[in-house]
């Protein structure tokens, strides 16, 4: 058959069709490749898993969860793990999901440093990773109760129990990467699979850093020269606090040298030696001192009236004087200084450093409760565990011993002795600050803040109990520019303030963060409860910059050295941050040219929790400590620790 010749038009048509087909195939290939790439990225694997139980056998697991030696896995459908309990399987997994069980394996598994809570002859209850697991055993004749052991399991039953009997106890001096430092033992290494169990009340598993320094919080189980587990059998009575004392002006943690002068007799303990430091005698230490050959010197008072003056540092009233025990440790770069003191005595030094001692007694009592609640939480948080302290003596925690105490402060602390604020069963978070703008705010002003603590919230500080929405620019501007709004703080000089910051200074501040050129505009784009700034957008000649959270915003927009006009009293000078985040901002122009920005605001401090000046004015109006705390921390109760 003779083929017909194609015309030019037909050839062009076929060419176009061919190109379309090629393109479609190419795209299909691309799509297939994308799919293949996606599948390759999914963590599909064959894993060996030991099955300890499912939601049917372990309380706390859902019906679609299984607990293994590699943690909790999920599964879909009606997959049955009953035939595989207390045995090893090979399974196909995708992340933490079991897709398919391949087969049963003959493998022994070890539960390391687990807590045996109880047992009978054919079952043993183990607490590990927050779960109680009943494991089958055969003719077990020994009774266990809250003991640490390694347990070996294979083929559906316990094959071996290796009980760990050796333990040490003693005051924990510090918790470091290289181990736990114990009084009389030094630093003892911690095993890689260390476990810490609380066995009173509800059983809990904790972390190493929840072992509270300065106490003997738990029995420490030792195996092969390492601490492998800890068991806390009863609550700790938190009667003492360990305070890291900073240098003059609270500038540094590390001291080049330390000089102490005894006001009363002290015993000096160092490297197994003991000496007496008598009244009036001085002890001067530097990193090369013979006293520090084993890195630590401890000075213990011989009676309750003995005090140590630290003459190498200065506070507002001169060289500070401390009750309690003083420890000096050699650290990289110099010496570290810690004061271990009774919690109530510590508050004698905190309350006057945080609130003027001349304030009303009921306000001082409220401050004492807040300071005690804060200190209690910080002891448990163990923030300076690496250095053997709970807090330092600066504004990073609570200012301590910066001003002398007096009889009214002692009375306020004593009349509230042992009292804290609680919300439910937990000690409350008790933020406080100097002066409000008339309205407070919540914890989300800070970068990691949440609304978890509902008692820290925005409220109008007067007796009207009015709720105001100050999150809009219009409403907040109306509120903050009203210098006569009657609240508990309205008689304070910082109740309303105004500062103008030149354009050059604002530009320099912002360009030190990010060079966006000369600033052209500042706009508050979001306000939190009470009207405090949450987000600010800065526009420069070279770009824009968004600032978030009140502290960062106050620092960036500071008018250091500029005059601050206050509603009452003398003008003040701007510092390293604006007085508060409760402000509005306006352009300052001359003949149409931008010259700077005017910030008009109210209050002094972050604005969350208790206004100290507001508390004092409430006390002046006849309010009690309980009434003051009920306003600022709504829903909390005053309770014994």
Show the residue positions of the predicted features:
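Conserved, single-site charged/polar hotspot
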Residues: 2-641
């Amino acid at each position: 058959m003779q083929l017909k010749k194609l015309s030019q038009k037909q050839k062009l048509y076929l060419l176009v069709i061919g190109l379309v087909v090629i393109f479609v195939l190419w795209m299909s290939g691309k799509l297939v490749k994308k799919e293949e790439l996606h599948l390759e990225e999914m963590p599909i694997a064959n894993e060996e898993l030991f099955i300890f139980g499912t939601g049917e056998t372990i309380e706390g697991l859902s019906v679609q969860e299984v607990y293994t030696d590699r943690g909790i896995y999920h599964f879909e459908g009606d997959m049955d793990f009953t035939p595989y309990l207390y045995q090893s399987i090979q399974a196909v997994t995708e992340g933490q999901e079991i897709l398919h069980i391949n087969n049963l394996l003959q493998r022994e598994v070890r539960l390391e440093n687990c807590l045996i809570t109880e047992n009978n002859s054919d079952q043993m209850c183990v607490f590990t990773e927050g779960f109680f697991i009943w494991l089958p055993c055969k003719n077990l004749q020994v009774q266990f109760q809250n003991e640490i052991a390694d347990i070996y399991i294979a083929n559906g039953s316990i094959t071996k129990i290796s009980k760990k009997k050796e333990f040490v106890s003693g005051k924990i001096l510090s918790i470091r990467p290289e181990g736990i430092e114990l009084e009389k033992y030094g630093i003892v290494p911690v095993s890689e699979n260390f476990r810490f169990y609380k066995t009173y009340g509800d059983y809990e598993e904790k972390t190493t850093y929840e072992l509270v320094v300065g106490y003997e919080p738990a029995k420490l189980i030792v195996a092969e020269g390492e601490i492998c587990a800890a068991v806390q059998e009863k609550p700790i009575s938190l009667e003492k606090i360990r305070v890291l004392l900073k240098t003059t002006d609270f500038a540094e943690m590390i001291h080049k040298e330390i000089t102490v002068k005894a006001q009363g007799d002290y015993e000096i303990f160092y490297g197994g030696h003991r000496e007496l430091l008598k009244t009036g005698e001085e002890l001067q230490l530097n990193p090369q001192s013979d006293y520090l050959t084993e890195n630590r010197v401890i000075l213990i008072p011989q009676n309750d009236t003995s005090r140590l003056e630290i003459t190498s540092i200065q506070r507002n009233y001169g060289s500070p004087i401390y009750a309690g025990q003083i420890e000096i440790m050699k650290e990289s770069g110099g010496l570290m200084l810690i004061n271990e003191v009774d919690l109530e005595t510590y508050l004698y030094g905190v309350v006057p450093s945080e609130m003027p001692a001349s304030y009303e007694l009921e306000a001082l009592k409220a401050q004492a409760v807040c300071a005690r609640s804060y200190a209690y939480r910080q002891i448990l948080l163990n923030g300076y565990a690496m250095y053997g302290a709970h807090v330092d003596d600066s504004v990073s925690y609570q200012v301590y011993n910066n001003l002398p105490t007096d009889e009214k402060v002692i009375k306020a602390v004593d009349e509230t002795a042992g009292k804290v604020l609680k919300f439910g069963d937990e000690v409350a978070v008790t933020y406080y600050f100097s002066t409000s703008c008339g309205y407070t705010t919540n914890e989300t002003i800070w970068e990691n803040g949440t609304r978890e603590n509902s008692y820290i919230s925005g409220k109008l500080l007067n007796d009207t109990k009015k709720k105001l929405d100050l999150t809009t620019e219009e409403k907040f501007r109306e509120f903050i520019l009203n210098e006569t709004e009657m609240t508990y703080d309205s008689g304070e000089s910082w109740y309303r303030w105004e500062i103008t910051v030149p354009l050059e200074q604002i530009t320099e501040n912002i360009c030190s963060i990010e060079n966006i050129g000369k600033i052209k505009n500042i706009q508050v784009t979001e306000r939190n409860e009470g009207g405090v700034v949450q987000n600010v957008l800065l526009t420069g000649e070279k770009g824009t910059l968004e600032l978030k959270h009140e502290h960062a915003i106050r620092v960036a927009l500071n008018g250091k050295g500029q005059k601050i006009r206050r509603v009452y009293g003398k003008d003040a000078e701007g510092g390293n941050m604006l007085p508060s985040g409760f402000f509005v901002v306006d352009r300052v122009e001359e003949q149409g040219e931008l010259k700077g920005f005017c910030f008009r605001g109210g209050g002094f401090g972050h604005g969350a929790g208790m206004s100290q000046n507001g508390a004092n004015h409430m006390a002046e109006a006849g309010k009690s400590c309980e009434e003051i705390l009920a306003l600022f921390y709504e829903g909390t109760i005053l309770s014994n620790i």
